[in-house]
Swiss-Prot record:
Disulfide bonds join 326-380, 355-362, 374-455, 413-439, 482-505, 493-511, 500-530, 524-535, 558-595, 562-600, 573-585. Binds 1 zinc ion per subunit. Gene3D superfamilies: 2.60.120.830, 3.40.1620.60, Collagenase (Catalytic Domain), Thrombospondin type-1 (TSP1) repeat. Residues 469-548 form the Disintegrin domain. This is A disintegrin and metalloproteinase with thrombospondin motifs 12. Residues 705-831 are annotated as: Spacer 1. Metalloprotease that plays a role in the degradation of COMP. Also cleaves alpha-2 macroglobulin and aggregan. Has anti-tumorigenic properties. Inhibited by alpha-2 macroglobulin. Residues 1541-1581 form the PLAC domain. One of its GO terms (molecular function) is metalloendopeptidase activity. The C-terminal four TSP1-like repeats are necessary and sufficient for binding COMP.
C-alpha cells in the first residue's frame, strides 16, 4: 500500500499555499483596550498566546462606507442564491489591524460542496449521531485582503460569517486567525470584539526515522492488479466497462472523517472550516491541467468523531488503521449511488502519529490502497494532520487510489533538478506550482480508460464547479518568492528589470536566478502585475480559460510491417491550455487505426515470438535463456514467455506492443491496443461490428456465396482413395460418414507425399488440427467419423478415405464464392486508382495541383488504404497552376546563425523585404507598399538561456609593489568552470602588470644645452662635443638619423596630460585585464629582475628628456604647433635593419612626488591613449626615460624589467636659465618624444622613468659643462645607483635646436635646471612577498627619509610600510565518515562526502577549484569493500503451520556457517500458511421422510461456513476439506407397514408405463385412477398413520 513520506510535504509550492491553519509564536501582547474573556477555555488559550490583537470588524460596502456592525450574511436561501447566480454573494468587511485598515473582499464559496452536503457528529456509534445539512448556509466565504488606498489584494482570506468572523487570512508578513470573543456583550457602538492572533507552529520539528513502509514495488502492483481484475470479474459481470481513450468529466464524491484528536485539536467550532479549506485546496490540485483529465473533488459528507467510534480502531500502526477504516467506511456507505451521501472515496484525517510497518514514530503521513477507486472496500485512505501540507497528503493518497505510483518507482519520472511533482516521494522548496508528472498523467489516464472509474460518471447534485482562482503572486510578493527559493535571508534584486520573465534574487550580495518567471499576480509596476510572463495593467481577476483541443498529431509509425499493426495519433489540450481554473478538455484524446493489414509470410515467426526473443540477450537470474511465448487467456495483452526446455514462465511485459493479436490462430482479428484487447471487424476498424458472410465477404449478405455438396459412393477400395478436392478459400467445411464403418478419413496436400491427418497408415487421436490456414476438428465416436473446419483454407487439400471395410457413403460440403475459382478476394477486389485534381495550392500567383491515388474496392468505391498493397501505391501526381497576381506581402528570409552560442547577448537576424509575386519571380518593392501588413521581426534574441562554457575570471588588481621606480601589481586569474570544461589557455588574461613607473626624486641633476641637436632627424656633423649622443656598443656603429617613421608597435597619438592616469585605470577596470594591447605585454609567470641577465652584449641605453614648464606661465605662441604630428618628432631605424642605432628623445610632463594623484603607468608602445590629471605643482621638471630597444626582430614581449638610473651628472654642464612662460596654458601639454631604439639580445623592451625636480626661478647657479674628447661615443652607464652612472645629457646646441623647432623657448632660460637643490623625500623599498601563502597576511617594505633623518620628511605623508594581502583562501579537503558497505561479501562499495572547506573557518565551504592546487589527488569518494566471496545459506526444513486455518506461520532455521553470506539474499525464516478461513460444517433440519413405513429416507442441507463473524464474500471462500462432511441422507420409518383391511393390490390394472405417466401428472388423487393403478397410486394413509408420522418429526426435531 503506497504511503507518503513526511519529507515529501516538508516543502510547499506557492500554487496552493492560499490558506494555512496552525499557529506561529512571536511578538508581544498588544491590545487597544482591556477586554474580558467570559469563556474560560478561550481565555486560557488567548492568554497563552505571545501576541494577539482585539479588533471590531464592521460590514462595509464596496466603497468602504460602514453598513452595519452585524456581520452575518443576510441571504438565507442557499438554493435561491445558487439559482440566481450569486449576484448578492459579494461581501465586504473592514478591520483595523496593526495600525492599518484591512478590507476583505469576500464571495460565498459554493464550489466544492454538494447540495446534499451533510455534517455528522458521532458520539460512539450510530445511535448517537447528530446530522446537520450545512450546505444551505452561505457562511463560508473566500476572497482577498486589501489595504487602504490599494486596489490589488495583498493577501487571501477564508472566513466564516455565521457567528461573527471566524477563520483565517494571509498577509505578506504572516498568517493570522480571527475569531469572536465568545459570550462577550456588544459594545456601546454595537460592535462585537474579535481577537486576531498570529499563526503559531504546531509543534517543534521532530527527528523521525526515515522509514516508510512503502510497498509500491512491481510485485505489489502486480498483486494489486490481479486482485482488482478478480474483483471486477466477480462483481461487475453485468457491467460493460468503457475502454476508450476519451476525456470525460469525473466527479469524486468524497467522505471526510476527522477523528477525536483532530476535533479536539482544532475545536468543534473551527474544525469544519479547517477541513473544508483543506479540501478546497485538494480540489484545486486536481484541476491542474498537468493531470490530463477533468476530475472534480466534491465533498458530500463530513463526519466529526466527538468520541471514539465503535468498530473503528485508529492506532499508530498505519496498515491496521487503514484496514479498520476501510472496513468501517464501507459499512456506513449507502449502497445506492443515488443516495445523496453515497461516497466514492473516504478520507480519514487523524492527529495520531501514524507509521507504516512499525509501531513507533516515523515519517509516514499517509497510506492508501493502490488502484482502489470505485471498490467500496478499498477506496479509502488515511492522512496525518500536519497543517497546510495536509492538502498535498490527501491529493497524493487520492492519486494512489487512481492507480498512480510514486514517481521514480517502476517508471522514469524521477524528479530531475529542482522541480518536484505531486507524486514525488520528497518535495523541495520551489516557488513554481506543484504539478502532476507525465507518468502520473499516464497512470490515471490508463486507469480511467480501462473503465475502472465507472463510479465517477454520475454528476452530484451541484450548481457548478467553476474554480475561484487567486493568482499566487497576489499573495506572495517578490521578496517572499525569493525566500521560498533561497531561504529567509534572500531578497529581490531591485536592479534587474522585467521580473515577469525572470525572477532574480539577491543572495549574499549576488543576484541569482533559477530562470523561472515570477508568479502570476506579482506586482511589476504602478497598477500593473505579471500575467503569463507579461506585465499588464491590473484589472479584474483573470477570467477562467477553458481548455480546447489542439490539432491531431501525425500518425505514428506502424507497429508492424505485416499482419495488421497499429498507428496512433493524439492531441493535447493546449488550444488554448486551460488556465485560471478553466475546465480540461473532454473528448477523445488518442485514437488508433490499423495498418499493414496484409498477411505475413508463413515462414516468419509470430509477433509474440519476436517480442519474447528480445529477452534472449537479457540475463534472467544471472542466466540467459531462449524464450518463446506462452498464451494466457486471462490476460491476453500481457507478454508471458517460457524458456525452451524449462517448466516455468514469466511475465515479461505488462502490455504487449500495439497490434499484437489477442489470440493466436483462429479467425479472430482482435488486437491489443494500449494493453487492452480491442475488437476488430472484418473492415479492420477498431471497435467495429463488421462481420463476414458465409463465404468471407465483409459486410456481405451471402448473395455471392454458393455451397457445394457432394457424396462419395465408392463401396470398395484398397488403401488411401481420393474422395474429393477442397479448393483454396473454402469455408464451412463438413465431412461425415453416412453410417458407422471401420474406415478412416484422411487429409493430404496437393503433394501426394505430404499428409496432414491419418497419413502413413497411422491413425491419430480425436482433436483439433491446424492445417491449410484453418483448424480441422477430427471427431470419431465408435466407428462414425466426421471432420469440421470453419475455413478459409489458404491452399487446396485432398480428402481421402483409408479403406478397411465397405464404404456406406461419405457426404461433404463447403462454401465458396460464385465469381471465380480463386477465393483470395483481397487481390481481386482492391486496387489503386487516381482521384480528382485538388484545388490550386495558392489563391494567387503560381501554385500546384495534386492528384493522389486512393484504394478502391471493386464496385464499392474508396476504402481504407490498408486494404491495398502499400508497395504498389503510385506516387502523387502534381502540376502547376496560376491564379491572379498576388498583392504585396512581407517576405522573411532564413535566420542567420546566432551571434553568440551562449550568454545573455545572443541575437540573430534575417532579411525582411516587401515583395510581390510576378509570375514565377518575386519582385522587391518599397517597404511602404506593405505598411498595412504586420512586419515580421528581423531581429530576435537567441541562445540566451544557454550557459556559456568555462571562461577566465579576473580579480581586482593589488596595490603596486613600489610607489616609484617601477614595480609590479598582481591579480587572481581563475577559470570559472561551466559544464566542467577547461578554459582556453591561449585567452588567459595577464596576472601581473607593471606599475609605479614614474621616476623617484633625486638631486644634483643639471643640463647643458647642445646646439647640434637636429630635430629634423638629420645627422649634423659638428666639431663641438655632443654629450647627448650616447656611446654605442662596441659591436655597433653610429648610423645617421633617417626620415622620421613610426614603428607599428608604437603609437603616434599624444595623450593629454590631465587624462593619462584615468584612462589607464578605466581601461584596465573595464577590460578586467591590464596591458592587454601592449606590445610589451608580460605573459603569466614572467619575472621582473632588477638587472639584465645578459652578458653577451651590453644593451644600449637611451634617455629621453621630459620638460614641464610652469603651467601658469605658458605662452600659447611659444608652444608652437598643436597637432599631434607637430608634437611628435620620432626618428627610428627600420625594423629590418638589425645593425642600426636610432636615437629617440622624449619630452614628457613631470609631476611632483608629493602629489596625491593616483599612480600612473606609462607603457612603452602601448597603443592606448592615456590621460592623466594635471598636477598643480608650480615646479617645472624633467623626466628621463631609459628605453631598452631590441637589437633584432623579436616578439615585443616583456619578461624582464631593467631598473634605470638617473642621467649621469658627469656630463652635465652649467644650469641654463629658463624664462618663465607668460601665458597660462589652457588644456594640456603634449609629450615630446625622441626615442632611441637600439637592438637588444634578449628581445625585450624595458622602460623606466626618473623625475628631476626643477628649482624655482631665481635659484639658478651657473656651472661649467665638461666636453667629451670623443664626439661619437659616450661611456655606457654601468650602475643603477641614483647618485652615479652615465648617460646622455642635453647640451646647449641641443637646446638651441629644440628652440628652433618650437620645443624650448630660449636656451639661456633653462640654466636654472643646473641648481643643486632638492628637498628631502621618502625612499621606499620593494614590497616583500606575502607573509602567508593563503589566508590573511601582510606585505612589508622599508620606508626611510632620503636625508637619513625621518624628521626632514615630516611634511610629506609617510608611505605605508605594510598592507594586507589575501592570495587565496586556505583550502583543504574535509571528508566525512564512510558509509556502510553496500554488500557484506563478494565486493561492495562504500561512499563518503568530500568537501572543499576553509581550513581556518571550518564552517565555510569553498568551491572545489580552491582545492585543486593542493598536493596530491583529492580524497576518493568511494572505495570497494568486503571483497571476500559470499558463502551459501544453510536452511532447515519448515516447521508445521502454527494454525490449521485463519492464517498461521511456518518457521525454519537459516544460518550462515562462515559468517560471510549475502544478507540481501538471506532466505525467509517465516512464511504464512493456512490462510484459508476457519470454517466448519453447519447442518440444517431433516426434511420429512419420504415414506411412512417400510424404510424410507430423509435429507438435510449442509453448508461450509466461517467459524467467526464474516461477510457473504468470505463465506464463498470457505473450505471444509479438513473435516468429515456430515451425512446428508439418513434412513427413516424402518417399521413395517401395517396391512390395511382393504383388499391387497398386487398389480396395476392398466399398464405400468401408463400408470406412471398418470402419477407424474398427479392424477392419483382421482378415485378411478387410484383404483385402476392401485400399485402405482397407493391409498392415502389413515389418520392413525398420520399421527405417528407427526410424532416422529417432533422426535427428530428434539434430537437436533
Amino acid at each position: 500500500m503506497p504511503c507518503a513520506r513526511g519529507s515529501w510535504l516538508a516543502k510547499l509550492s506557492i500554487v496552493a499555499q492560499l490558506i494555512n491553519f496552525g499557529a506561529f509564536c512571536h511578538g508581544r501582547q498588544t491590545q487597544p483596550w482591556p477586554v474580558r474573556f467570559p469563556d474560560p477555555r478561550q481565555e486560557h488559550f488567548i492568554k497563552s498566546l505571545p501576541e494577539y490583537h482585539i479588533v471590531s470588524p464592521v460590514q462595509v460596502d464596496a466603497g468602504g462606507h460602514v453598513l452595519s456592525y452585524g456581520l452575518h450574511h443576510p441571504v438565507t436561501s442557499s438554493r435561491k442564491k445558487r439559482a440566481a447566480g450569486g449576484s448578492g454573494d459579494q461581501l465586504y468587511y473592514r478591520i483595523s489591524h496593526e495600525e492599518k485598515d484591512l478590507f476583505f473582499n469576500l464571495t460565498v464559496n459554493w464550489e466544492f460542496l454538494s447540495n446534499g452536503y451533510v455534517v455528522e457528529k458521532r458520539y460512539g456509534n450510530l445511535s448517537h449521531v447528530k446530522m446537520v445539512a450545512s450546505s444551505g448556509q452561505p457562511c463560508h466565504l473566500r476572497g482577498t485582503v486589501l489595504q487602504q488606498g490599494t486596489t490589488v489584494g495583498i493577501g487571501t482570506a477564508a472566513l466564516s460569517a455565521c457567528q461573527g468572523l471566524t477563520g483565517f487570512f494571509h498577509l505578506p508578513h504572516g498568517d493570522f486567525f480571527i475569531e469572536p470573543v465568545k459570550k462577550h456583550p456588544l459594545t456601546e457602538e454595537g460592535s462585537y470584539p474579535h481577537v486576531v492572533y498570529r499563526r503559531q507552529s504546531i509543534r517543534a520539528p521532530e527527528t523521525k526515522e526515515p522509514i516508510c513502509g512503502l510497498k509500491d514495488s512491481l510485485d505489489n502492483s502486480v498483486k494489486q492488479e490481479l486482485q482488482r481484475e478478480k474483483w471486477e470479474r466477480k462483481t461487475l459481470r453485468s457491467r460493460s466497462l468503457s475502454r476508450r481513450s476519451i476525456s470525460k468529466e469525473r466527479w469524486v464524491e468524497t467522505l471526510v472523517v476527522a477523528d477525536t484528536k483532530t476535533v479536539e485539536y482544532h475545536g468543534s467550532e473551527n474544525v469544519e472550516s479547517y477541513i473544508l479549506t483543506i479540501m478546497n485546496m485538494v480540489t484545486g490540485l486536481f484541476h491542474s491541467p498537468s493531470i490530463g483529465n477533468l476530475v472534480h473533488i466534491v465533498v458530500v459528507r463530513l463526519i466529526l468523531l466527538e468520541e471514539e467510534e465503535q468498530g473503528l480502531k485508529i492506532v499508530h500502526h498505519a496498515e491496521k488503521t487503514l484496514s479498520s477504516f476501510c472496513k468501517w467506511q464501507k459499512s456506513i456507505n449507502p449502497k445506492s449511488d443515488l443516495n445523496p451521501v453515497h461516497h466514492d472515496v473516504a478520507v480519514l484525517i487523524t492527529r495520531k502519529d501514524i507509521c507504516a510497518g512499525v509501531n513507533r514514530p516515523c515519517e509516514t503521513l499517509g497510506l492508501s490502497q493502490l488502484s482502489g477507486m470505485c471498490q467500496p472496500h478499498r477506496s479509502c485512505n488515511i492522512n496525518e494532520d500536519s497543517g497546510l501540507p495536509l492538502a498535498f497528503t490527501i491529493a497524493h493518497e487520492l492519486g494512489h487510489s487512481f492507480g498512480i505510483q510514486h514517481d521514480g518507482k517502476e517508471n522514469d519520472c524521477e524528479p530531475v533538478g529542482r522541480h518536484p511533482y505531486i507524486m514525488s516521494q520528497q518535495i523541495q522548496y520551489d516557488p513554481t506550482p506543484l504539478t502532476w508528472s507525465k507518468c502520473s498523467k499516464e497512470y490515471i489516464t490508463r486507469f480511467l480508460d480501462r473503465g475502472r472509474g465507472f463510479c465517477l460518471d454520475d454528476i452530484p447534485s451541484k450548481k457548478g464547479l467553476k474554480s475561484n482562482v487567486i493568482a499566487p503572486g497576489v499573495i506572495y510578493d517578490v521578496h517572499h518568492q525569493c525566500q521560498l527559493q533561497y531561504g529567509p535571508n534572500a531578497t529581490f534584486c531591485q536592479e534587474v528589470e522585467n521580473v515577469c520573465q525572470t525572477l532574480w534574487c539577491s543572495v549574499k550580495g549576488f543576484c541569482r536566478s533559477k530562470l523561472d518567471a515570477a508568479a502570476d499576480g506579482t506586482r511589476c509596476g504602478e497598477k500593473k502585475w505579471c500575467m503569463a510572463g507579461k506585465c499588464i495593467t491590473v484589472g479584474k481577476k483573470p477570467e477562467s480559460i477553458p481548455g480546447g483541443w489542439g490539432r491531431w498529431s501525425p500518425w505514428s509509425h506502424c507497429s508492424r510491417t505485416c499482419g495488421a499493426g497499429a498507428q496512433s495519433a493524439e492531441r493535447l489540450c493546449n488550444n488554448p491550455e486551460p488556465k485560471f481554473g478553466g475546465k480540461y478538455c473532454t473528448g477523445e484524446r488518442k485514437r488508433y487505426r490499423l495498418c499493414n493489414v496484409h498477411p505475413c509470410r508463413s515462414d516468419t515467426p509470430t509477433f509474440r515470438q519476436m517480442q519474447c526473443s528480445e529477452f534472449d540477450t537479457v540475463p534472467y537470474k544471472n542466466q540467459f535463456y531462449r524464450w518463446f511465448p506462452v498464451f494466457n487467456a486471462a490476460h491476453p495483452c500481457e507478454l508471458y514467455c517460457r524458456p525452451i526446455d524449462e517448466q516455468f514462465s514469466e511475465r515479461m511485459l505488462e502490455a504487449v506492443i500495439d497490434g499484437t493479436p489477442c489470440f493466436e490462430g483462429g479467425n479472430s482479428r482482435n488486437v491489443c491496443i494500449n494493453g487492452i484487447c480491442k475488437r476488430v471487424g472484418c473492415d479492420y476498424e477498431i471497435d467495429s461490428n463488421a462481420t463476414e458472410d458465409r463465404c468471407g465477404v465483409c459486410l456481405g449478405d451471402g448473395s455471392a456465396c454458393q455451397t457445394v455438396k457432394k457424396l462419395f459412393r465408392q463401396k470398395e477400395g484398397s488403401g488411401y482413395v481420393d474422395i474429393g478436392l477442397i479448393p483454396k478459400g473454402a469455408r464451412d467445411i463438413r465431412v461425415m460418414e453416412i453410417k458407422a464403418a471401420g474406415n478412416f478419413l484422411a487429409i493430404r496436400s496437393e503433394d501426394p507425399e505430404k499428409y496432414y491427418l491419418n497419413g502413413g497408415f497411422i491413425i491419430q487421436w480425436n482433436g483439433n488440427y491446424k492445417l491449410a490456414g484453418t483448424v480441422f476438428q477430427y471427431d470419431r465416436k465408435g466407428d462414425l467419423e466426421k471432420l469440421i473446419a470453419p475455413g478459409p483454407t489458404n491452399e487446396s487439400v485432398w480428402l481421402q478415405l483409408l479403406f478397411q471395410v465397405t464404404n456406406p457413403g461419405i457426404k461433404y460440403e463447403y462454401t465458396v464464392r460464385k465469381d471465380g475459382l480463386d477465393n483470395d478476394v483481397e487481390k481481386l477486389l482492391y486496387f489503386w486508382q487516381f482521384g480528382r485534381w485538388t484545388e490550386c495550392s495558392v489563391t494567387c500567383g503560381t501554385g500546384i495541383r495534386r492528384q493522389a491515388a486512393h484504394c478502391v474496392k471493386k464496385g464499392h468505391g474508396i476504402v481504407k488504404t490498408t486494404f491495398c498493397n502499400p508497395e504498389t501505391q503510385p506516387s502523387v501526381r502534381q502540376k502547376k497552376c496560376h491564379e491572379k497576381d498576388c498583392p504585396p506581402r512581407w517576405w522573411a528570409g532564413e535566420w542567420e546563425a546566432c551571434s553568440t552560442t551562449c550568454g545573455p547577448y545572443g541575437e540573430k537576424k534575417r532579411t525582411v523585404l516587401c515583395i510581390q509575386t510576378m509570375g514565377s519571380d518575386e519582385q522587391a518593392l518599397p517597404a511602404t507598399d506593405c505598411q498595412h501588413l504586420l512586419k515580421p521581426k528581423a531581429l530576435v534574441s537567441c541562445n540566451r538561456d544557454i550557459l556559456c562554457p568555462s571562461d577566465w575570471t579576473v580579480g581586482n588588481w593589488s596595490e603596486c609593489s613600489v610607489s616609484c621606480g617601477g614595480g609590479v601589481r598582481i591579480r587572481s586569474v581563475t577559470c570559472a568552470k561551466n559544464l566542467n570544461e577547461p578554459c582556453d589557455k591561449t585567452r588567459k588574461p595577464n596576472s601581473r602588470a607593471l606599475c609605479g613607473l614614474q621616476q623617484c626624486p633625486f638631486s644634483r641633476r643639471v643640463l647643458k644645452p647642445n646646439k647640434d641637436i637636429a630635430p629634423s632627424g638629420k645627422n649634423q656633423s659638428t666639431a663641438e662635443h655632443d654629450p647627448f649622443k650616447p656611446i654605442p656598443a662596441p659591436t655597433s656603429r653610429p648610423t645617421p638619423l633617417s626620415t622620421p617613421t613610426v614603428p607599428e608597435s608604437m603609437s603616434t597619438s599624444t595623450p593629454t596630460i590631465n587624462s593619462l592616469g584615468s584612462t589607464i585605470a578605466s581601461q584596465e577596470d573595464a577590460n578586467g585585464m591590464g596591458w592587454q594591447n601592449n606590445s610589451t605585454q608580460a605573459e603569466e609567470g614572467s619575472h621582473f629582475p632588477t638587472s639584465s641577465g645578459s652578458t653577451s652584449q651590453v644593451p644600449v641605453t637611451s634617455w629621453s628628456l621630459s620638460i614641464q614648464p610652469d603651467d601658469e606661465n605658458v605662452s600659447s605662441s611659444a608652444i608652437g604647433p598643436t597637432s599631434e604630428g607637430d608634437f611628435w618628432a620620432t626618428t627610428t631605424s627600420d625594423s629590418g635593419l638589425s645593425s642600426s642605432d636610432a636615437m629617440t628623445w622624449q619630452v614628457t610632463p613631470f609631476y611632483s612626488t608629493m602629489t596625491t594623484d593616483p599612480e600612473v603607468e606609462i607603457h612603452s608602445g602601448s597603443g592606448e591613449d592615456s590621460d592623466q590629471p594635471l598636477n598643480k605643482d608650480k615646479s617645472n621638471s624633467v623626466i628621463w626615460n631609459k628605453i631598452g630597444v631590441p637589437e633584432h626582430d623579436a616578439p615585443m614581449e616583456t619578461d624582464a624589467e631593467l631598473p634605470l638610473g638617473p642621467p649621469p651628472t658627469s656630463y652635465m654642464g652649467e644650469e641654463p636659465s629658463w624664462p618663465p612662460f607668460s601665458t597660462k596654458m589652457e588644456g594640456s601639454l603634449p609629450a615630446w618624444s625622441f626615442k632611441n631604439e637600439t637592438p637588444r639580445d634578449d628581445g625585450m623592451i624595458a622602460e623606466k622613468s626618473r623625475k628631476i625636480p626643477l628649482p624655482l626661478a631665481g635659484d639658478h647657479h651657473p656651472a661649467t659643462s665638461e666636453k667629451l674628447e670623443n664626439h661619437d661615443k659616450l661611456a655606457l652607464p654601468n650602475t643603477t645607483n641614483p647618485t652615479q652612472g652615465f648617460g646622455p645629457v642635453l647640451t646647449e646646441e641641443d637646446a638651441s635646436n629644440l628652440i628652433a623647432e618650437g620645443f624650448l623657448l630660449n636656451a639661456s632660460d633653462y640654466k636654472h635646471l643646473m641648481k643643486d637643490h632638492s628637498p628631502a623625500y621618502w625612499i621606499v623599498g620593494n614590497w616583500s612577498k606575502c607573509s602567508t601563502t593563503c589566508g590573511l597576511g601582510a606585505y612589508w617594505r622599508s620606508v626611510e627619509c632620503s636625508s637619513g633623518v625621518d624628521a626632514d620628511c615630516t611634511t610629506i605623508q609617510r608611505p605605508d610600510p605594510a598592507k594586507k594581502c589575501h592570495l587565496r583562501p586556505c583550502a583543504g579537503w574535509r571528508v566525512g565518515n564512510w558509509s556502510k558497505c553496500s554488500r557484506n561479501c563478494s565486493g561492495g562499495f562504500k561512499i563518503r562526502e568530500v568537501q572543499c572547506m576553509d581550513s581556518l573557518d571550518h564552517h565555510r565551504s569553498l568551491r572545489p577549484f580552491h582545492c585543486q592546487f593542493l598536493a596530491g589527488a583529492p580524497p576518493p569518494l568511494s572505495m570497494s569493500c568486503n571483497l571476500e566471496p559470499c558463502g551459501e545459506w544453510q536452511v532447515e526444513p519448515w516447521s508445521q503451520c502454527s494454525r490449521s486455518c485463519g492464517g498461521g506461520v511456518q518457521e525454519r532455521g537459516v544460518s550462515c556457517p562462515g559468517g560471510l553470506c549475502d544478507w540481501t539474499k538471506r532466505p525467509a525464516t517465516t512464511v504464512p500458511c493456512n490462510r484459508h478461513l476457519c470454517c466448519h460444517w453447519a447442518t440444517g433440519n431433516w426434511e420429512l421422510c419420504n415414506t411412512s413405513c417400510g424404510g424410507g429416507s430423509q435429507k438435510r442441507t449442509i453448508h461450509c461456513i466461517p467459524s467467526e463473524n464474516s461477510t457473504t464474500e468470505d463465506q464463498d471462500q470457505c473450505l471444509c476439506d479438513h473435516q468429515v462432511k456430515p451425512p446428508e441422507f439418513q434412513t427413516c420409518n424402518q417399521q413395517a407397514c401395517r396391512k390395511s383391511a382393504d383388499l391387497t393390490c398386487l398389480k396395476d390394472r392398466l399398464s405400468i408405463s401408463f400408470c406412471q405417466t398418470l402419477k407424474s401428472m398427479r392424477k392419483c388423487s382421482v378415485p378411478s385412477v387410484r383404483a385402476q393403478c392401485c400399485l402405482s397410486c397407493p391409498q392415502a394413509p389413515s389418520i392413525h398413520t398420520q399421527r405417528q408420522r407427526k410424532q416422529q418429526l417432533l422426535q427428530n426435531h428434539d434430537m437436533l
